[in-house]
């Protein structure tokens, strides 16, 4: 595969063709059969839109983890899934057909409407497959699942029936977030996904009492931001523990919380105080009389309830139980209604008033705020605007209303303890999601609304009598066929809504609702395999038992459920992660997944949301076609976005990965391939052991991180190793490798290609096939490596220290140093003795001297380390006093062992020690060792510097001329003195024979000389 001057995008396309031609993914699946299972669940996206960076991110995470565990020796099923039902699809059809109400769908016919939905569900599936393939993700579309397939839907029915048979499904009325654009209620986690800042009315409304209170004919004052709910007012709520004050305003008397009066009426004087408890039961005049008949049921009275707060408003709450959950609960609490009773709720599914509210009938409620306030202007004490957070429909981006609706619920609230226990069994990355966000969501979980008043979805499999007094829950297609006497080929609404079941002389008809699509996606671990109807070996969930069952059942559960790994975005803590967790906990008493990687959001570089309209981000195809998928993958997984943080996407970041990882890797590969045919020399060189140890440490560290699902450090580890390989080993042994010492490099490159397979699948394959044509690199298991420290690492530290001293003292690396003195323990020096020549060469030092370190070489200062001392506050002050009195000798002894003074043990971490070397030269202490350099120059060293500078210039001229490493050149410069100096230190051919390849100018001794570079023919 390897070719010089390769285009990396073309390399990736070549690898794609290799995978297609050899059916590499399919063969990898065949090869792993019979291995221990690693189970992965793929969260289903909708195919009604094109994939974006969020999908590329989650796809990269999923592919990286599953590739890694495949190469760890596991059998990993990788199947793609499609979310086909629900609001996203219906909303697209509503826009396409101009549908704005439920009635229009019914007029059109559910069958025709659902046919339209079915027609667009897989609209972009081919584009999805192309992008997923180009990303390098190995996943099966052929064996994937679709939530609209009857096998999947039948399994969902079975899950529903299991819950129903356990008494976990019930029908009730609840005030819920309601999308008037989509004509359906939303769950609480859906309503939390799209809050916006909006401007709403902020009004004070007077509610006159029917009888005097304390000698005053007065009105209670309530604050509201929803004037449209005033026609449905049914009560006022106060807190029994609050004090309320009577005050006069414009010759009328009013009552509100004593501490809130000054907020709205600055000069008001409190005339009388009364407790909230004393107000309970008082009757008042409501703003509108549309529901006056409810007065005889106890409505239009003051209720005392603890939900009323004094942080804003007036301490008096206008209650419209048809539109406020707390209001509804207060009415239940006071016995005015029973749970699930109907109350006034005169708003239809499109957010328009019904005929019950005659004056505003047919109008959208929020459009009526001004008219309502105008009609009751004599009761309006304040009319202002307020900007506050308000929930919008996540799909239609329209304001939600809170509205009483009939609904089907899963009982979750009673099982919170089980949900929390199972959460403890899950490894979350990052971990704070587990202990904060997800834990808090579970702790406050409410019963789950699972029904939607829509059309394109899995129908709720309940057939009920007209009065709902009896129900039949269907758990399979066969069961419905048996009860109906009909052959069933599809279980969407249009095919089964007309089925009437007759039993014991009664008629049962199906309820109208469909299941929330989140219920479907939460059922995917079972429905993707058509559980419990499928008995296929390898994906056998047919014996998965809600009660545990025999040993064979337990074995199957262990092999196929729960998932070892899932990964999606942070928003899924209230979406897919939650629904998976609820269903598995309720049915099987265990979590649905054991490890989860939670990613954040990919934003534009300016920190704003990526927007096609603003064009504030590069198209993914541009990134693929400019830098390649590998660079994008590594950029994404090396960022905080894989730990639930947001990422400001930078094209420059992708380019940097290409520059710092892929290109040095390619150059190292090329250098080896150009020289591997040279007869091996059989020698062993000092740094062979080091580069082997460096690779082992890299592979060991990477494996350790990945087994903990910590992806973000992969790039750092890879860059550190590729630097060791290209900038140290190859650079230092370039001549030796050309001469035949290439076996170690070849073996390292081969193993590096294998280890990098999950992260850079394209270039890993390209590299591996160039080294070892044949089987895919992705079939190879990871090498077994150990972690350890090689002595050359200390030599590298010494080299870095000398270079740092040069830099801080403005001494060029081309300037030779007369000597560098290493002061350290004898054991440290013994460890680096084999690398003294390498240290001298890398530091451009003529002589490396050694002195064993002792106390007399340093002036010691010491001070307390507060960060360490504060861990034990009982001894902190005493230790600080002791440390401040330590002598230099005592402080020095702390470097090797603890010190006991006045009965207190002082540890090394308790102090900050500064060692200043006693010498007049350039010196610095570096922890385990100290360095002194002698930069005095003699004539020979000056000439050496001149030679190195000219040699460096020639290397740069070669590069700019496009010459390769192995090209022999002749240099022409008409300066005999310079040529004489350079020839003493470097093997450079001078002359003017060959093909002219480059020109330049070089300054020597104040004169500028022309330089020509000729390539030998």
Curated annotation (Swiss-Prot):
Family annotation (SUPFAM superfamilies): Anticodon-binding domain of a subclass of class I aminoacyl-tRNA synthetases, Nucleotidylyl transferase, ValRS/IleRS/LeuRS editing domain
EC number: 6.1.1.5
Cellular localization per UniProt: Cytoplasm
Catalytic activity: tRNA(Ile) + L-isoleucine + ATP = L-isoleucyl-tRNA(Ile) + AMP + diphosphate
Motif window: 'HIGH' region: 45-55
InterPro entries: aa-tRNA-synth_I_CS, aa-tRNA-synth_Ia, Anticodon_Ile_ABEc, Ile-tRNA-ligase, Ile-tRNA-ligase_type2, M/V/L/I-tRNA-synth_anticd-bd, Rossmann-like_a/b/a_fold, tRNAsynth_Ia_anticodon-bd
One of the protein's GO biological processes: isoleucyl-tRNA aminoacylation
GO CC, alphabetical: cytoplasm
A GO term, aspect molecular function: aminoacyl-tRNA deacylase activity
Organism domain of life: Eukaryota
PROSITE patterns with a match to the protein in the record: AA_TRNA_LIGASE_I
Any Pfam family matching the protein: Anticodon_1
EC category name: ligase
NCBIfam families membership: ileS (TIGR00392)
Protein name, entry field: Probable isoleucine--tRNA ligase, cytoplasmic
Organism this protein belongs to: Encephalitozoon cuniculi (strain GB-M1) (Microsporidian parasite)
């Amino acid at each position: 595969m390897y070719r010089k001057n390769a285009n990396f995008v073309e390399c990736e396309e070549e690898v794609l063709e290799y995978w297609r031609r050899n059916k590499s993914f399919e063969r990898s699946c065949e090869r792993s059969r019979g291995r221990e299972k690693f189970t992965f669940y793929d969260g289903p996206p909708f195919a009604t839109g094109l994939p974006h960076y969020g999908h590329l991110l989650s796809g990269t995470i999923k592919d990286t983890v599953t590739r890694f565990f495949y190469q760890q020796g596991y059998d990993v099923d990788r199947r793609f899934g499609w979310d086909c039902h629900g609001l996203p699809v219906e909303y697209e059809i509503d826009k396409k057909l101009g549908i704005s109400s439920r009635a229009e769908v019914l007029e059109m016919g559910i069958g025709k409407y659902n046919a339209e939905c079915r027609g667009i569900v897989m609209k972009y599936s081919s584009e999805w497959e192309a992008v997923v393939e180009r990303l390098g993700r190995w996943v099966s579309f052929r064996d994937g699942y679709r939530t609209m397939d009857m096998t999947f839907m039948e399994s969902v029915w079975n899950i529903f029936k299991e819950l129903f048979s356990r008494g976990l499904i019930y029908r009730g009325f609840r005030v819920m977030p309601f999308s008037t654009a989509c004509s359906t209620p939303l769950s609480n986690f859906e309503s939390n996904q799209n809050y916006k800042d909006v401007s709403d009315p902020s009004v004070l409304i007077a509610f006159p009492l029917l009888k005097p209170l304390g000698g005053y004919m007065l009105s209670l004052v309530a604050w509201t931001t929803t004037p449209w709910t005033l026609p449905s007012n049914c009560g006022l709520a106060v807190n029994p523990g609050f004090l309320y004050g009577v005050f006069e305003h414009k010759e009328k008397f009013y009552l509100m919380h004593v501490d809130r009066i000054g907020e709205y009426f600055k000069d008001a004087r409190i005339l009388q105080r009364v407790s909230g408890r004393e107000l309970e039961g008082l009757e008042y005049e409501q703003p509108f009389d549309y529901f006056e008949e409810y007065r005889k049921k106890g409505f239009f009275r003051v209720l005392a309830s603890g939900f009323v707060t004094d942080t804003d408003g007036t301490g008096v709450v206008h209650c419209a139980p048809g539109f406020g959950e707390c209001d509804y609960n207060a009415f239940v609490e006071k016995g005015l209604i029973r749970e699930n009773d109907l109350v006034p709720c005169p708003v239809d599914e499109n957010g328009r008033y019904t005929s019950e509210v005659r004056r505003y009938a047919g109008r959208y409620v929020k459009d009526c705020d001004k008219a309502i306030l105008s009609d009751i202007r004599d009761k309006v004490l304040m009319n202002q605007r307020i900007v506050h957070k308000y929930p919008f429909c996540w799909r239609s981006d329209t304001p939600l209303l809170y509205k009483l609706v009939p609904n089907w619920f899963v009982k979750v609230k009673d099982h919170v303890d089980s949900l929390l226990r199972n959460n403890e069994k899950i490894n979350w990355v990052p971990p704070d999601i587990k202990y904060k966000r997800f834990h808090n969501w579970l702790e406050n979980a409410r019963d789950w609304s699972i029904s939607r008043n829509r059309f394109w979805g899995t129908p709720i499999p309940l057939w009920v009598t007209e009065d709902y007094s009896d129900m039949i829950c269907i758990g399979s297609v066969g069961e419905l066929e048996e009860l109906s006497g009909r052959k069933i080929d599809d279980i969407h609404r249009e095919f089964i809504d007309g089925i009437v079941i007759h039993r014991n002389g009664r008629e049962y008809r199906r309820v109208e609702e469909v299941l929330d699509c989140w219920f479907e996606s939460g059922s995917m671990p079972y429905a993707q395999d058509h559980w419990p109807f499928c008995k296929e070996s390898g994906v056998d969930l047919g014996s998965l038992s809600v009660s545990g069952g025999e040993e064979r059942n337990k074995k199957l559960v262990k092999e196929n459920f729960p998932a070892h790994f899932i990964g999606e975005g942070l928003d899924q803590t209230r979406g897919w992660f939650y629904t998976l967790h609820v269903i598995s906990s309720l049915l099987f008493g265990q979590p649905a997944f054991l490890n989860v990687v939670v990613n954040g959001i990919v934003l534009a570089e300016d920190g704003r949301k990526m927007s096609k309209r603003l064009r504030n981000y590069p198209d993914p195809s541009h990134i693929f076609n400019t830098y390649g998928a590998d660079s994008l993958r590594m950029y994404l997984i090396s960022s905080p976005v894989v730990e639930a943080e947001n990422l400001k996407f930078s094209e420059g970041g992708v380019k940097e990965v290409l520059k710092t990882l892929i290109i040095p890797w390619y150059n190292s590969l090329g250098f080896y391939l150009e020289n591997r045919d040279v007869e091996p020399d059989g020698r062993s060189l000092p740094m062979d052991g080091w580069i082997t140890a460096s690779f082992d440490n890299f592979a060991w560290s990477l494996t350790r991180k990945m087994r903990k699902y910590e992806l973000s450090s992969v790039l750092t580890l890879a860059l550190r190793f590729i630097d060791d390989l290209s900038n140290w080993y190859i650079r230092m042994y370039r001549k030796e490798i050309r001469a035949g010492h290439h076996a170690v490099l070849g073996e390292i490159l081969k193993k590096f290609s294998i280890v990098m397979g999950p992260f850079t699948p394209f270039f890993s394959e390209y590299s591996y096939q160039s080294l070892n044509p044949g089987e895919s690199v992705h079939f190879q298991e990871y090498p077994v490596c150990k972690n350890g420290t090689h002595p050359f690492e200390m030599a590298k530290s010494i080299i870095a220290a000398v270079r740092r001293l040069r830099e801080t003292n403005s001494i060029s690396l081309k300037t030779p140093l007369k000597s560098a003195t290493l002061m350290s323990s004898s054991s440290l020096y013994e460890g680096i003795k084999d690398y003294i020549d390498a240290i001298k060469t890398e530091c451009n030092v003529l002589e490396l001297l050694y002195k064993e370190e002792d106390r007399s070489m340093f002036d010691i200062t010491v001070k307390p380390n507060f960060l360490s001392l504060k861990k034990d506050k009982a001894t902190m002050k005493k230790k600080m006093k002791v440390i401040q009195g330590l002598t230099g000798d005592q402080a020095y002894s702390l470097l090797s062992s603890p010190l006991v003074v006045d009965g207190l043990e002082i540890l090394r971490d308790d102090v900050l020690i500064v060692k200043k070397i006693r010498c007049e030269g350039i010196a610095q202490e570096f922890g385990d060792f100290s360095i002194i350099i002698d930069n005095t120059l003699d004539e020979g060293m000056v000439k050496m510097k001149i030679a190195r500078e000219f040699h460096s210039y020639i290397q740069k001229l070669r590069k700019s001329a496009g010459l390769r490493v192995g090209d022999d050149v002749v240099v022409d410069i008409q300066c005999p003195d310079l040529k004489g100096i350079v020839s003493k230190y470097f093997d450079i051919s001078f002359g003017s024979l060959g093909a002219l390849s480059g020109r330049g100018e070089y300054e020597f001794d104040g004169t500028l000389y022309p330089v020509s570079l000729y390539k030998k023919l």
